[in-house]
Structures are given as structure tokens and as C-alpha cells.
Amino acid sequence: MDANTQNISEATIALIDSLKSTTSHYGLANSGSEYKIITEMFLYKYFNDKFGYEAKRDKIYGERLSKADKWDAEYDKFTEEEVEDLFSYLPASVPLLKPEHTLAHLYNTSGAGDFSTRLDATLIDIANLNADTFSVVTSGKSRVNIFSALTQFVTDPQKRDDFARSLMSSVASFNFESVFAEKYDFFSRIFEYLIKDYNNAGGGKYAEYYTPRAIAQVMARLLVGDNADLRGMTCYDPSAGTGTLLMALAHQIGEDRCTIFSQDISEKSSEML
């Protein structure tokens, strides 16, 4: 593991621990809702940083955003027409965020009342905006959005705003843009860390046969070899966990030269996928 990957791995763990500290403080430690809160807040952070990274590379609007002191503050100045125009230029694999969806925009409103409602509404709005590209399809062909309201898991409504602020404070303190060019699989790292933690706490054996990221990379190299001429490949894993092996295969083959399909019976794994 190179130094930059090691740093981002450590930052990922630090972020998880920060979020777990918040959920523990509000009585949600080692619960199913804690797992959902951590993964969804991390995904929101991922969406925010990924969108910013790609928007600043856009040929039309990239220079304007990248030269600004803060890209998200400049993005707040975009008209609705400019936002839609930017969306049309971004690759289909990039999550879309409107100016009011960015982490900085939302965080700057955290001092206002009813912040928990604002956080939940933002997550649901992002899920709806990206439903065609980022969602889970069940075996019954139902579509499950990737985000849902999170602050409802705190039973006391009077504590929800502070809970939301604490969650936002955790994710606002990190920036993962520097690692996107390296194809780092964030979610396999989260999965490995959380599952080990939950199994230790509860004595369970959930996902005891998951494939560690390092092993998945070796398996992908063995399966693909040095073949640089692969085109239009299809990869399917019916028990994918978080998709670590599929991600490794896609990176080895080339993301633009393959299509991956994943499935898992576990609800936790499906959320990760």
C-alpha cells in the first residue's frame, strides 16, 4: 500500500470512528440504524467530493469552479440553466448535486432551526435526483433509493438537530478528492472495518467470508492477466457483498470496457452495493 493510499485508508477509518462516536452518544451503538447512518453519511460525503472533483475537470465550467477559492461557493452562484448545462456535460457515472445539495451549502445552514429536517430532505432529494443511476433493485424489481431520512432514528425530536449537526461536522472535516484518480475502493474498507467491529461486539459471524480488498486485487490480476484487448466484457457476482471483487475486476479490465452486475441476499450488503 503506497503512502497516499495508506493516508486515505486512515482518514476513512477516522471518519467512521467520528461518526460512530456520534451514534454512540445518541444511543445507537452497534444497531442496524447505526450501520445505515454511517454508510449513508459516508456516501453523501463521497457524492459531494466526487461531484466537485468531476465538475472542476469539466471542459466548459471546470475552469470557473477550479479557480474559485471554494468551488462550492462558486457553484452556489450558478443559475438553474447553468446547473442543468453542467449536468449534461458530466459523465453518466458521476452523481449529480444541485448547489443546495453540497455539503458546504448544507453545513453553512446548520445554525438555523430544524436542521435535522433539512438534512433528511437533502438526502432524499439527492436520492431522487440520482435514482436512475444510483439505486438498488430488489429481486422483485422494486427500486430502493440510496438515501433515506436518518435523524428519525433518534427518538427524542428535541435532540435531532444536534445529532444532524454532529454528523455534518464529522464529514465536513475530510476531503477525499485527491484519491479519486487512484480508483480507491472506499466502501470495501468501510465494510471490512464495520463488519469486524460489529462481529466483535455481538459475537456474530456476519460476512465472515468476505474478500479483503488486497486479495480481490490479486484475484482480478489472475483472472484478467495481461490481456489489454478485452472489450464489452460482462462480470456478474451473485453473492457480491460490497462488490469488492467486481470493483477490482472493473479496474483491471478498464471501467469503459466492461459492465458489472452485482447481487446479494443481505440487506446490509445491498445497501453497500
For the regions a protein language model found, what residue spans apply to each?
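Non-catalytic, mostly N-terminal accessory regions of nucleic-acid modification and defense proteins
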Residues: 1-227
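Conserved S-adenosyl-L-methionine
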Residues: 205-273
